[in-house]
Regions:
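C-terminal beta-strand edge segments of enzyme domains
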Residues: 137, 212-214, 220-326
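N-terminal glycine-/serine-/threonine-rich phosphate-binding loop
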Residues: 1-41
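Short beta-strand-to-loop element that shapes/binds the nucleotide-sugar donor at the catalytic cleft/hinge
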Residues: 91-96
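CN hydrolase (nitrilase-like) catalytic-core segments centered on the catalytic cysteine
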Residues: 73-88, 155-259
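Active-site beta-strand/loop signature of hydrolases that rely on acidic residues for catalysis
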Residues: 23, 34-61, 82, 90, ...
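Conserved hydrophobic/aromatic positions in well-ordered beta-strands
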Residues: 9, 107-109, 241, 260
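Active-site catalytic loop in hydrolytic enzyme cores
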Residues: 80, 97-209, 274-280
Length: 326
């Protein structure tokens, strides 16, 4: 890996609602364009094939009509374009699994014909869309392991850390933000109702800072791509973002809506402070991270006669402010 680079592009794609064939064709055309710029990997947004920012309003029949299997027409179109151009590509869709369940899935099509699918872990888009149950990390011909976290998956620090612990040094973070407010801000994705705050003021600007922190904490590159539907084509500064393992921004799309591109210096991964701190972790201290809130409260109810190990007893005296100390 030493001395090698990987040229990537983050594409803030604007989808046409419900028109998977059109969106797949547009992505295929985009791969031709980025291939001319020497791009090896192009990252498109969450649900870029399916479209729709607000899937919760779709009827059961509409959602079923939108869903495709992983070997469906849209993925085949994209995979064929990858083979023609030599540019690996990540795209999002509503997946219909063989058992009939629906997932918010993201598929990475590689130049060697391999495909890797991540099912969103925290899916709250529609009551019929099921959450995935595992993290996705895989090897590549570039000598790095790549992880995928879709949308709100990357809001949780534990998910990003898990991909790093599974060996990922490049994190693909496709996203789909909400409709723009009157001020032009794009809200982040909602949490499941049971965890939701009555006031949610986080915006894409907030996520910009989170992603830089996640990259630095874990010593990994993060390639973030945000998408909108065609009726909501206002670009944002954070629509495409590439961050290095020190948390420094390598490239953004700016307000033009064009893709962001950067050369990833893969040798910088092991030199990063985040990787050094990963090696210094003490897992025996972190059991609490795997417990629910209810389990935490039971575990840390202090028993009677408990003493703090390693502490030093301190004594205090109350002295009148006018009394002289002797």
């Amino acid at each position: 890996m030493a001395g090698s680079t990987l040229r990537v592009a983050s594409v803030p794609f604007v989808s046409r609602d419900g028109d998977c064939a059109h969106n797949a064709a547009q992505i295929a055309a985009c791969l031709v364009d980025v291939a001319r710029e020497g791009i090896a990997l192009a990252v498109f947004p969450e649900l870029c094939l399916s479209g729709y920012t607000d899937t919760a309003k779709l009827s059961r029949a509409s959602l079923d009509a939108l869903a495709e299997p992983l070997d469906g027409a849209s993925i085949r179109t994209v995979a064929a374009a990858v083979q023609r151009t030599g540019v690996a590509c990540g795209v999002g869709l509503i997946e219909r699994a063989p058992d009939g369940r629906l997932f918010n899935s993201y598929v990475m099509c590689l130049q060697d014909g391999a495909r890797h699918c991540h099912r969103k872990l925290h899916a709250a888009e529609h009551r019929r869309i099921v959450s995935g149950d595992r993290h996705t990390v895989f090897d590549t011909g570039w000598g790095v392991r790549i992880g995928i976290l879709t949308g709100g998956d990357s809001y949780l620090v534990e998910n990003v850390r898990m991909t790093a612990l599974l060996g990922a040094s490049v994190l693909i973070a496709p996203h789909r933000s909400g409709r723009a407010s009157r001020t032009g801000e794009h809200p982040l994705q909602p949490l499941p109702m049971m965890y939701r705050s009555p006031v949610d003021t986080d915006t894409m600007e907030s996520m910009h800072g989170w992603l830089c922190a996640r990259a630095a904490d874990n010593g990994m590159f993060i390639v973030f791509s945000d998408g909108h539907e065609a009726s909501n084509d206002q670009a944002t500064d954070a629509a495409a973002l590439i961050v290095d393992p020190s948390g420094l921004v390598l490239a953004t799309s700016g307000t033009s809506g064009a893709y962001a591109a950067a050369n990833l210096d893969l040798a910088s991964i092991e030199r990063s402070r985040g990787r050094q701190w990963l090696a210094a972790r003490r897992p025996d201290l972190y059991a609490l991270l795997a417990q629910s809130a209810a389990d935490r409260s039971r575990e840390y109810d202090e028993p009677p006669n408990a003493s703090a190990r390693g502490s030093v007893a301190l004594g205090f005296a109350v002295v009148s402010r006018h009394r002289l100390m002797r």
